[in-house]
């Protein structure tokens, strides 16, 4: 058979990805022509990271049997990474949960009982009793939910609506708190609106790429393949990679920079100083479109108020800032000289200058990419603000080929966690619970009494752990995440809180994860194409998919669980009399009636679904639930810069990037000719701010919450590897991926290993002030730490690396710093 050049390149890309992981390409990925007639194909976004690759899913006899990259998908253009090629296998692990499991002893629930199969009716009976008891005895603040950037858009919307409007509790937060919260607050502080202004099309037009704490080669491999193609096709294109250790992205780097942990703040201020000292400020852009402010400092570390670091902080948690002049800002960054920066960071001067020159050169279009290195940082918001400073000083923003771009790690951290408003402080379309006008907009649109939504910010992820341990949060529903393994400092707060007899923990999951096995009730959940869904990726692209198969056994989607559970509560049981008096017609109605079976949500009939189209939730309820929820939600953003297209448009497209106005998506926000919200003659308008100007912040270096000392003498950084995604609850059930990287290891510099009498392959005990794990020494391989630092991935349930990590957070975003704590090693 003769191959076209395109087919040849695709086939080789697949083989290369597989070879890099030590794998053979699975038969299901080959989509053999002879089988295609027997296989039904439909589109879906990939289940894994926030890149948002499009895939074609092949189903046969009620199972997903094949998967291939969608050649019509603009994100990945027919390619998949190695995880994407094994998507069919994530749903068929041998230990897939198919019925609810409750801890029982002598025929009834018991905290120390054995997991026993029960019906959904029995499961909801116990949940109902626990919710109602806590609501009656302690009120809405005694219940909470921990959700996900892997929820579909309507699942997140339904969860936020149920908790914030139904139960009147803002104690709902997504696991995106652990990965994207600093990016959110950074965007809001600088631009007044969340999410990137650019898109992936920038890659083919950029002259330079700077990676700040992002190993795109392994974590966003499809985007990295596009960057690689751009770099190798033009010798003038440059790539700079900054990290606290060397990794696979360094292989392409023209300037690979390893810096001392936390000192990225110093480098960012040095570059701003370099730009000013070399007269590289875009004065016209700066004068018209930028304000300057000096931020509060010494803001603490998000630890408990009794912690010595919090007591010592002068301005704990302060988001305050004050105006400053350009001369004052110039003097502020002038302290970050080349000599000082080289000394504080450990980076050679010539490398620092080369990096600064990329930003300062007016003829270089620069994209800054970052992921967890910036965000999982006790000054993550500051790091985000400081990188925006570089683009605002030079005017390299909101135009093709240049701009700051925060990459997401989950498939709908943007579309669900951020845009829908599932954070404990947010409402849809960048609105917040503390703003009375925003609450009023939601209450009127949802047709619920004024004052229903609480004005108090709910508990964020780490605060939920602490409240569980303290007995203040007593009923906790965890959906679509594995936070017992993924969250920080397992031993001190989370595990004690989950196993406290005062508390009842529900986990909805397809598999018996560490979280599920630590709970009191496990609810079996439908996965991916076992339900109709929608995700929003890192470039503001909203993508839909249809239900293509049924879930096994009694497994139900998160949406089904939320909506059906809402039937258990009447308004009189959850709302005070003062609210009911405003709308007496709501008396006697259930939360299902008030929130999900309203005229606005239920107006789309089943006739809009094709006769043979699967949609378990809608067919059970008698109306097109997903469409009703989406259209109700989309109303919030239309006309306000968050415009989403009509529901049906997404099923006919490979995703659309908002704002979508008059059927046209937006590639670059805030610039004239690209963004429909920027009028002719305005040039640029950062319309999230009242005056249309973005903000440059003066923010200093401040040290990490914990650093190595004589006893705990090494930095620990945690993260991921190519073959596994997050806690491995899906990828470790794919035999090929598990074989490729079967267990976590400790990546360590050979000299550090030698000094501790350790050799490659030795068992080693890694200890911090909070706990310990036993791992395996690795002195070679893809990750090459400098002396003084070790790196461990967190996918391995047998090596709970978060026994070691500290629950210090960015005080502004409440996002955990998983990249910096102090450990010691001992040979086992």
Curated annotation (Swiss-Prot):
Its EC number is 1.9.6.1. It comes from the Bacteria. Keywords: 4Fe-4S, Electron transport, Iron, Iron-sulfur, Metal-binding, Molybdenum, Nitrate assimilation, Oxidoreductase, Periplasm, Signal, Transport. SMART domains: Molybdop_Fe4S4. Substrate binds at residue 794. GO terms for cellular component: membrane; nitrate reductase complex; periplasmic space. It catalyses: 2 Fe(II)-[cytochrome] + nitrate + 2 H(+) = 2 Fe(III)-[cytochrome] + nitrite + H2O. Pfam families: Molybdop_Fe4S4 (PF04879), Molybdopterin (PF00384), Molydop_binding (PF01568). Its cofactor is [4Fe-4S] cluster; Mo-bis(molybdopterin guanine dinucleotide). Binds 1 [4Fe-4S] cluster. Binds 1 molybdenum-bis(molybdopterin guanine dinucleotide) (Mo-bis-MGD) cofactor per subunit. The keyword Oxidoreductase applies. [4Fe-4S] cluster binds at residues 46, 49, 53, 81. It is found in: Periplasm. Its main location: periplasm. Predicted to be exported by the Tat system. The position of the signal peptide cleavage has not been experimentally proven. One of its GO terms (biological process) is nitrate assimilation. Mo-bis(molybdopterin guanine dinucleotide) binds at residues 83, 150, 175, 179, 212-219, 243-247, 262-264, 372, 376, 482, 508-509, 531, 558, 718-727, 802, 819. Residues 1-31 form the signal peptide. One of its GO terms (molecular function) is nitrate reductase activity. Component of the periplasmic nitrate reductase NapAB complex composed of NapA and NapB. Belongs to the prokaryotic molybdopterin-containing oxidoreductase family. NasA/NapA/NarB subfamily. Catalytic subunit of the periplasmic nitrate reductase complex NapAB. Receives electrons from NapB and catalyzes the reduction of nitrate to nitrite. HAMAP family: Nitrate_reduct_NapA. NCBIfam families: NAPA, PRK13532.1, TAT_signal_seq. This is Periplasmic nitrate reductase.
């Amino acid at each position: 058979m003769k191959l076209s050049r395109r087919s040849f390149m695709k086939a080789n890309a697949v083989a290369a990805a597989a070879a890099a992981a030590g794998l053979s390409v699975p038969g299901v990925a080959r989509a053999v022509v002879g089988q295609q007639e027997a296989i039904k194909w439909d589109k879906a976004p990939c289940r894994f990271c926030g890149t948002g690759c499009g895939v074609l899913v092949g189903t046969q006899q009620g199972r997903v049997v094949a998967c291939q990259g969608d050649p019509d998908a603009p994100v990945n253009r027919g390619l998949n990474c190695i995880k994407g090629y094994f998507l069919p296998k994530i749903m068929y692990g041998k230990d897939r949960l198919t019925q609810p499991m409750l801890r029982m002893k002598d025929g009834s629930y018991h905290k120390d009982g054995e997991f026993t199969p029960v019906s959904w009716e029995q499961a909801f009976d116990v949940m109902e009793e626990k919710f109602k008891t806590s609501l009656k005895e302690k009120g809405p603040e005694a219940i909470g939910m921990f959700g996900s950037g892997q929820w579909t858009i309507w699942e997140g919307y339904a969860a936020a609506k149920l908790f914030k409007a139904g139960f009147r509790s803002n104690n709902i937060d997504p696991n995106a708190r652990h990965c994207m919260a600093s990016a959110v607050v950074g965007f809001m502080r600088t631009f007044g609106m969340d999410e990137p202004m650019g898109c992936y099309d920038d890659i083919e037009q950029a002259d330079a790429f700077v990676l700040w704490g992002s190993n795109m080669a392994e974590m966003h491999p499809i985007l990295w393949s596009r960057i690689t193609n751009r770099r190798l096709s033009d010798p003038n294109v440059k790539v700079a990679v900054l990290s606290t250790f060397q990794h696979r992205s360094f292989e392409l780097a023209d300037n690979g920079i390893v810096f001392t942990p936390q000192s990225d703040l110093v480098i960012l201020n040095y570059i701003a100083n370099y730009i000013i000292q070399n007269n590289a400020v875009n004065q016209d852009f700066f004068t018209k479109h930028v304000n300057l402010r000096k931020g509060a400092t010494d803001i603490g570390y998000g630890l408990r108020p009794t912690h010595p670091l919090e007591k010592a902080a002068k301005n704990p948690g302060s988001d305050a800032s004050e105006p400053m002049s350009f001369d004052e800002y110039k003097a502020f960054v002038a302290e970050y000289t080349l000599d000082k920066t080289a000394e504080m960071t450990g980076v050679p001067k010539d490398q620092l200058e080369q990096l600064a020159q990329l930003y300062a050169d007016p003829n270089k279009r620069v994209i800054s990419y970052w992921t967890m290195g910036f965000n999982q940082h006790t000054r993550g918001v500051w790091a985000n603000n400081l990188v925006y400073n570089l683009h605002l000083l030079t005017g390299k923003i909101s135009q093709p080929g240049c701009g700051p771009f925060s990459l997401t790690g989950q498939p709908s951290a943007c579309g669900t966690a951020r845009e829908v408003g599932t954070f404990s402080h947010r409402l849809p379309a960048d609105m917040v619970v503390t703003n009375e006008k925003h609450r009023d907009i939601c209450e009127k649109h949802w047709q619920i009494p004024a004052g229903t939504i609480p004005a108090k910010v709910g508990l964020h992820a780490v605060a939920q752990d602490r409240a569980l341990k303290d007995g203040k949060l007593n009923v906790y529903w965890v959906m679509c995440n594995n936070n017992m393994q993924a969250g920080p400092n397992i031993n001190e707060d989370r595990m004690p809180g989950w196993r406290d007899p005062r508390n009842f923990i529900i986990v909805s999951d397809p598999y018996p994860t560490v979280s599920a096995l630590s709970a009191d009730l496990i609810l079996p959940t439908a996965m991916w194409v076992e339900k109709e869904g929608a995700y929003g990726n890192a470039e503001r692209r909203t993508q839909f998919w249809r239900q293509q198969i049924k879930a096994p056994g009694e497994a139900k989607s998160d949406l089904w669980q939320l909506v059906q559970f809402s039937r258990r509560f009447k308004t009189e049981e959850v709302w005070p009399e003062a609210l009911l008096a405003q709308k007496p017609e709501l008396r006697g109605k259930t939360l299902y009636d008030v929130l999900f079976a309203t005229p606005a949500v239920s107006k789309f009939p089943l006739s809009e679904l094709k006769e043979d189209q699967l949609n378990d939730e809608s067919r059970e309820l008698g109306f097109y639930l997903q469409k009703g929820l989406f259209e109700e939600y989309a109303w919030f953003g239309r006309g306000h810069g968050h415009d989403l297209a009509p529901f049906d448009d997404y099923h006919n497209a490979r995703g659309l990037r908002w704002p979508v106005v008059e059927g046209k998506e937006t590639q670059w926000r805030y610039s004239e000719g690209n963004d429909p919200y920027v009028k002719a003659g305005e040039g640029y308008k950062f319309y999230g701010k009242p005056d249309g100007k973005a903000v440059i912040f003066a923010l200093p270096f401040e040290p990490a919450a914990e650093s190595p000392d004589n006893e705990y003498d090494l930095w620990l950084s945690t993260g991921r590897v190519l073959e596994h995604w997050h806690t491995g609850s899906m990828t470790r059930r794919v035999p090929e991926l598990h074989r490729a990287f079967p267990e976590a290891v400790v990546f360590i510099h050979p000299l550090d290993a030698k000094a501790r009498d350790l050799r490659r392959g030795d068992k080693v005990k890694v200890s911090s002030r909070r706990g310990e794990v036993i791992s395996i020494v690795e002195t070679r391989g893809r990750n090459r730490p400098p002396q003084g630092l070790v790196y461990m991935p967190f996918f391995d349930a047998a090596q709970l690396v978060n026994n070691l990590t500290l629950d210090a957070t960015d005080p502004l975003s409440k996002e955990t710093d998983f990249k910096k704590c102090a450990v010691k090693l001992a040979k086992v």
